[in-house]
């Protein structure tokens, strides 16, 4: 199974990854995009290609009997589902780390982010919030200038199947990082327990032996 814990900047992705990776060390492998795709080029095309490499890693880890967690980058769920190899993991599950705009702004200021970029991060958080609720919302934001190998048609078909779009939101506003980590860990446990009852793509090929059975707005500033 591929688990995606995502969110805009300032939502606590890196901290959460450290917490859950330690708890599930014997059950899952975790990584950020740069760890599977090399130094970032900060382009949409690079991110799409990096997501595909992460999906391929998830498939490899799956063959070894573990799950794979992608956490640490602001990856929109649609990019995972549209990756060329996204029909190969036994399941995909998405968790969005979110927070109020005031909370996000304070976190970004406290960690020293450039004030001129903070409105961009907040706008992207709004987009991500809508994206997990409405998978087809403003897909132009992540399609234009992207990698031509992305399977967007397959992605649109998948969103017609309610069970193919599994997302969960954790509101981190006012929460201690450890508490957020525990909420994320609880979500991971729930996904592991229910994986056999969560179909991925409806017309997916039968798994190979050993693999198991298996969301008029202003323009959104790009952060990549």
Regions found by a protein language model. Give the residues of each.
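Walker A/P-loop
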Residues: 14
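Hydrophobic anchor at the beta1->P-loop junction of P-loop NTPases
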Residues: 5
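P-loop (Walker A) phosphate-binding loop of NTP-binding proteins
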Residues: 8
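Positively charged N-terminal leader segments that act as targeting/secretion signals
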Residues: 205-217
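Small-molecule kinase domains that catalyze NTP-dependent phosphoryl transfer to phosphate-bearing small molecules
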Residues: 114-180, 201-202
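ATP-binding Walker
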Residues: 11
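Glycine-rich phosphate-binding loop used to anchor ATP phosphates in small-molecule kinases
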Residues: 49-91, 96-101
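Conserved substrate/cofactor phosphate-moiety recognition/catalytic segment
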Residues: 17-59
């Amino acid at each position: 199974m591929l688990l995606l814990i995502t969110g805009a900047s300032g939502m606590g992705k890196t901290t959460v990854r450290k917490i859950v990776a330690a708890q599930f060390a014997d059950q899952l492998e975790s990584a950020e995009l740069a760890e599977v795709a090399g130094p970032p080029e900060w382009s949409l095309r690079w991110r799409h290609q990096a997501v595909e490499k992460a999906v391929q890693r998830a498939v490899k880890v799956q063959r070894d009997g573990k799950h794979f967690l992608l956490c640490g980058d602001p990856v929109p769920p649609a990019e995972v589902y549209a990756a060329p190899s996204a029909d190969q993991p036994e399941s995909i599950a998405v968790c969005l780390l979110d927070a109020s705009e005031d909370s996000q702004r304070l976190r970004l200021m406290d960690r020293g982010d450039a004030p001129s970029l903070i409105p961009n991060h907040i706008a992207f958080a709004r987009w991500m919030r809508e994206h997990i609720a409405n998978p087809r919302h403003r897909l132009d934001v992540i399609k234009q200038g992207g990698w031509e190998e992305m399977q967007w048609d397959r992605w649109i078909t998948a969103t017609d199947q309610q069970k193919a779009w599994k997302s969960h939101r954790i509101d981190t506003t006012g929460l201690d990082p450890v508490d957020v980590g525990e909420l994320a860990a609880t979500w991971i446990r729930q996904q592991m327990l229910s994986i056999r009852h969560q179909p991925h793509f409806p017309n997916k090929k039968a798994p190979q032996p050993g693999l198991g059975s298996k969301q008029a707005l202003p323009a959104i500033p790009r952060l990549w």
